[in-house]
Amino acid sequence: MSRDFSRTVRVADQIQRELALLIQNEIMDPRVGMVTLTGVEVTRDYAYAKVFYTTLGGDENIQLVEEGLKHAAGFLRSQLAGKIRLRVVPQLQFVYDESVERGMKLSRLIDEAVGKA
């Protein structure tokens, strides 16, 4: 059981590395600017992969980046097939990662609480 889990994690890490390079070097869509991939979760059968990302800018920019990534998902999957040796290359689903924003808000609240004490 743990061996299967570790392989899933290794595949997710490899997908994250390859996608980061592909987005940086191959995607020419102006909507997809400064994107940072924060994590990838792959299903056990490798059919689907959730790709978590962050980007700079407000809500409008987040929406534009998401549209650009969804538009490029097929291209990225086909490029990924040539770089990763898997029987099935997962379908990519891009999800905005709000954990960074939540962490900054919590840090700000802690700083305010410490400042008042």
Swiss-Prot record:
Subcellular location: Cytoplasm
One cellular component term from this protein's GO annotations in UniProt: cytosol
GO MF term set: ribosomal small subunit binding
Protein's UniProt keywords contain Calcium: no
Broad class of where this protein is predominantly found: cytoplasm
BP GO annotations: maturation of SSU-rRNA
InterPro entries reported for this sequence: KH_dom-like_a/b, RbfA, RbfA_dom_sf, Ribosome-bd_factorA_CS
SUPFAM superfamilies hit by this protein: Ribosome-binding factor A, RbfA
Keyword Cytoplasm in annotation: yes
PANTHER family (alphabetical): RIBOSOME-BINDING FACTOR A, CHLOROPLASTIC-RELATED (PTHR33515:SF1)
Functional summary from the UniProt entry: One of several proteins that assist in the late maturation steps of the functional core of the 30S ribosomal subunit. Associates with free 30S ribosomal subunits (but not with 30S subunits that are part of 70S ribosomes or polysomes). Required for efficient processing of 16S rRNA. May interact with the 5'-terminal helix region of 16S rRNA.
Subunit and partners: Monomer. Binds 30S ribosomal subunits, but not 50S ribosomal subunits or 70S ribosomes.
Official protein name in the record: Ribosome-binding factor A
UniProt gene name: rbfA
